[in-house]
């Protein structure tokens, strides 16, 4: 994993795993809404009533509908399950 993806991939993966609804703003101002179904180095698959493949180079901002907690390097799955860590 390259240094550029050290924050992006865990962030997108948390949004995907927790099925957090997101608003994605494109560089041309268009707002897309849905849940992140999948992603790779170049695209995000956004699911709403239909699935849309959105190229990352066209994305300006990803806004989750609620706050998300990113796992840090020392976190374990057990720590995420404890009350008060949400």
Swiss-Prot record:
Superkingdom: Bacteria
A GO term from the CC aspect: cytosol
Molecular function via GO: RNA binding
InterPro entries in the record: Hfq (IPR005001), LSM_dom_sf (IPR010920), Sm (IPR047575)
GO BP annotation list: regulation of DNA-templated transcription; regulation of RNA stability; regulation of translation, ncRNA-mediated
Record domain Sm: where: 9-68
Positions of the UniProt region annotated as Disordered: 66-86
The keyword Phosphoprotein is assigned to this record: no
Keywords associated with the record: RNA-binding, Stress response
Entry similarity comment: Belongs to the Hfq family.
Primary role: RNA chaperone that binds small regulatory RNA (sRNAs) and mRNAs to facilitate mRNA translational regulation in response to envelope stress, environmental stress and changes in metabolite concentrations. Also binds with high specificity to tRNAs.
Subunit structure: Homohexamer.
PANTHER family listed in its UniProt record: RNA-BINDING PROTEIN HFQ (PTHR34772:SF1)
Protein name: RNA-binding protein Hfq
Gene name, Swiss-Prot/TrEMBL: hfq
